[in-house]
Amino acid sequence: EGMLISFGKSNYINKAKQQPNKVKDVINKISTDGILETVNAVRSKLEKPIPLGYSNVGEVIKVGSSVKDIKVGDRVASNGPHAEMIAVNQNLCILVPNNVKDEEAAFTVIASIALQGIRLAKPDFGETFIVSGLGLIGLLTCKLLLSQGCNVLGIDPDSERCDLAKSFGVKTLKIGNNVDQVNWALNLTKNVGVDGAIITATAKSNEPINLAAKACRKRGRLILVGSSP
């Protein structure tokens, strides 16, 4: 979502730089449809609102003819955007059990993103992992790692996020200027390094990846769940 918001605030030139393949399409369209038609089409596309969000819960009000096992009136969780009414493919929906509240089911897709990062990291009982970025997905990643018997370190520039993670058992470090997070991680692992790093932060540079790699032991696992150049 942060990337979408940042993209939306960019001017046309910066948007073009971020989508070089689309620029080629624009050039081809100019040769076939002319400049004015192309300009109007591009402007319409770039100024079209994009719904945010990717995790919701709601009641089914209509189903397609080929949909199976989901019917009108069912309560489902999906990866659709935040809106009053949405259309979602069946393979991106799941029935919500009766004993699960809407407030709990709303975490389904977000938690699955965190869980996918953990699945790729293949943590083992007693291993130490560092989570870079303690936003919603980062915090869920920490909790899931703790539930698997891992030691969890968390880093984030926001002190409130660090305090929240610390409240359920994560060793945290508020990062900023002159903060050596690599030595901090090495000191907590007796200079061995962490067994793995999961990056759930959105960054404009490769710094989170580079620092996470330095904090890992030899043959440690590095998983990028967030975004980095």
Feature-to-residue mapping (PLM):
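Aromatic- and Gly/Pro-rich amphipathic surface segment
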Residues: 5-50
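A glycine-/small-residue-rich N-terminal strand-loop-strand element
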Residues: 37-79
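Short, surface-exposed secondary-structure boundary micro-motifs
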Residues: 63-65, 81, 134, 227
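Mid-domain Rossmann-like dinucleotide-binding core that forms the NAD(H)/NADP(H) cofactor-binding site
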Residues: 75, 101-178
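Flexible, gly/ser-rich surface segments that form the specificity/activation loops bordering the active-site cleft
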Residues: 79-85
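Short, compositionally biased
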Residues: 86-100, 149-150
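Glycine-rich cofactor phosphate-binding loops and adjacent beta1-alpha1 units
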Residues: 163, 168-229
